[in-house]
Amino acid sequence: MIHLKKIILFTILIILSACSSIPKNTQNSCAIFEERYLWYKHTKASYKKWGAPIHLQLAFVKKESDFDWLAKPPRKKLFKVIPFKRPSSSFGYSQAVKGTWEQYKRETNSPLATRARFKDSVDFIGWYIHKTNKILKISKKDPYKQYLAYYKGWGDYKNYSKDKKAIIYAKLVK
């Protein structure tokens, strides 16, 4: 009986630890990695696999979700009051939309990857930066253009000069 209680308690502890809270200081990558050592290992693994700089991965997560694993875009309002549909299917640390996330899972053979898991999100960001480099010939070390391509998507990147909001966001990613 005592053994069963320990197993149940341990299981609950594991589940609760998976519900990661937002780091205290999201402005400093060293502080983030001191608080979340595994996050450093995950970003480093993504860097080794895809060549996406660690600072760029963190900048994308900061800008997209502010390190909130359950982040979603705000709902549109009907008559400025009634909550309505969300403008996109983006979710999690990377704010990846469902279609692109499914493409990532297929191409990387990661059927169990989830947008709410930091490890999978930074691997997705690394994959996206790598593909952006291959498709659009944007340097992996160019945060401005890489973020514009991430924000607008590969197809809409060519028209980014018309989107003032995208330009402002891209200037904030460093």
Model-derived segments and spans:
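Sec-dependent signal peptide recognition
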Residues: H3-F10
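Second-shell loop/turn segments in exported
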Residues: Q27-F33, T43-Y47, P83-F91, E107-K119, ...
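Short secondary-structure subsegments characteristic of cysteine-rich extracellular domains
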Residues: A166-K174
